[in-house]
Design a protein with these regions (language model features):
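Glycosyltransferase donor-sugar binding loop
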Residues: 48-63, 79
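A charged, aromatic-enriched C-terminal amphipathic alpha-helix characteristic of glycosyltransferases
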Residues: 158-194
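A structural motif in glycosyltransferase catalytic domains
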Residues: 18, 33-37, 49, 112, ...
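Nucleotide-activated donor-binding/catalytic signature segment of Leloir-type glycosyltransferases, i.e.
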Residues: 62-84
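Conserved acidic donor-binding segment of nucleotide-sugar-dependent glycosyltransferases
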Residues: 136-143, 152-157
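Conserved donor-binding/catalytic core segment of Leloir-type glycosyltransferases
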Residues: 12-28, 34-37
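Short acidic alpha-helix that forms the nucleotide-activated donor recognition element
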Residues: 82-93, 114, 128
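Acidic donor-binding loop of glycosyltransferase active sites
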Residues: 88-104, 117-118
């Protein structure tokens, strides 16, 4: 069993999901993504969503809310993921969606850039100066806007590829940043073996 298969089995993750790695806190704004998923489901667009992060008690509220919207089967709530497993969650994800109400110091966009995954990100003051045109910006409290962004990236392959290309270029510009060196070393190590995998 290869490492990726082991991670999938151990964490029970699906493939091709929407991914948001962040602590379960109100200002991380998981709710907007949950609401967007409900909008998509009502349009017969079925997506899987994976959350992961440290929890100090707020995750239970999100789980109850997801159940209320009948999204139990669509959303997987994971706890904190260690640095060794995290790259593999990016590998199976289709898109990173971050609706945090605070930024722009978050690391996940850079992880997604390295892994060549498209990014949807909150349009907050200071974000554009950091991430430029490498992400699709959304109003973080507008679930309709987030749902439209998700559909745009899944339905428009050229646009998706453009975001991936610009994101990777942005990553290359910051490749020597020490803040990301540990994660990127893990990525480099498993990439050596990835080409031998049968997924």
């Amino acid at each position: 069993m290869n490492i990726q298969t082991d991670v999938r089995k151990r964490l029970k993750i699906p493939k091709d999901y929407i991914f948001y790695p962040a602590m379960y806190l109100p200002h991380k704004n998981h709710k907007t993504i949950i609401d967007a998923l409900k909008i998509l489901k009502n349009e017969n667009r079925n997506f899987k969503l994976v959350f992961c992060g440290n929890d100090i008690g707020y995750a239970s509220n999100l789980k109850k809310y997801s159940k209320k919207l009948n999204l139990n089967d669509e959303i997987l709530f994971l706890n904190f993921i260690n640095d060794e497993d995290l790259p593999y969650l990016y590998l199976d994800a289709s898109i990173l969606v971050m609706t945090s109400l605070i930024g722009p110091t978050n690391i996940p966009p850079w992880e997604a850039f390295k892994m060549k995954k498209p990014v949807i990100y909150s349009d907050l003051p200071g974000i554009r100066e950091v991430l430029g045109d490498a992400v699709h910006y959304v109003s973080p409290m507008n679930s309709v806007d987030v749902a439209k962004a998700i559909k745009k990236i899944f339905d428009d392959q050229d646009y998706k590829n453009k975001l991936i290309e610009k994101g990777f270029e942005k990553f290359k510009e910051s490749e020597n940043n020490d803040n990301f060196s540990k994660f990127f070393k893990i990525v480099k190590d498993f990439k050596k073996y990835q080409k031998t995998w049968i997924l």
